[in-house]
UniProtKB/Swiss-Prot annotation:
GO terms for biological process: translation. PROSITE patterns: RIBOSOMAL_S11 (PS00054). InterPro entries: Ribosomal_uS11 (IPR001971), Ribosomal_uS11_bac-type (IPR019981), Ribosomal_uS11_CS (IPR018102), Ribosomal_uS11_sf (IPR036967). It holds the Pfam family Ribosomal_S11. This is Small ribosomal subunit protein uS11. Belongs to the universal ribosomal protein uS11 family. The keyword Cell membrane does not apply. Located on the platform of the 30S subunit, it bridges several disparate RNA helices of the 16S rRNA. Forms part of the Shine-Dalgarno cleft in the 70S ribosome. It comes from Methylocella silvestris (strain DSM 15510 / CIP 108128 / LMG 27833 / NCIMB 13906 / BL2). The keyword Ribonucleoprotein applies. Gene3D superfamilies: Ribosomal protein S11. The gene is rpsK. GO terms for cellular component: ribonucleoprotein complex; ribosome. Keywords: Ribonucleoprotein, Ribosomal protein, RNA-binding, rRNA-binding.
Length: 129
């Protein structure tokens, strides 16, 4: 008795007009996630998934490529307007935002949601180069 092959179901195309783009830019990478208003993920991409490795992941160009890829996937679901939440200290923040605008999305608001401590944990030691 052979096992019946499980069929891989393709994701159905949701028709979502507006959403939230979460741009998380660290010193080493840039991650972009586009969600609907409830927070369910529609599409995501990062500089690492675009094929950049090592120190190239932290470049603005890598962030731009990741944002374009994420925007293309979200546009397939019918998304047109975005609120952008930018977080982190990395170099890919502005270029990812510009790439989302250039992809044809209407950006309604831009929020910086970088967590700032009220003197919480001790920071890591300063780099001496």
């Amino acid at each position: 008795m052979a096992k019946e092959a499980t069929r891989v179901r393709r994701r159905e195309r949701k028709n979502i007009v507006s959403g939230v783009a979460h741009v998380n830019s660290t010193f080493n990478n840039t991650m972009i996630t586009i969600t609907d208003a409830q927070g369910n993920t529609i599409s995501w991409s990062s500089a690492g998934t675009m094929g950049f490795k090592g120190s190239r992941k932290s470049t603005p160009y890598a962030a731009q490529m990741a944002a374009e890829d994420c925007a293309r996937k979200a546009a397939e679901h019918g998304m047109r307007t975005l609120e952008v939440e930018v977080s982190g200290p990395g170099s890919g923040r502005e270029s990812a935002l510009r790439a989302l605008q250039a992809a044809g999305f209407t950006v309604t608001s831009i929020r910086d949601v970088t967590p700032i401590p009220h003197n919480g944990c001790r920071p890591r030691k300063r780099r001496r180069v």
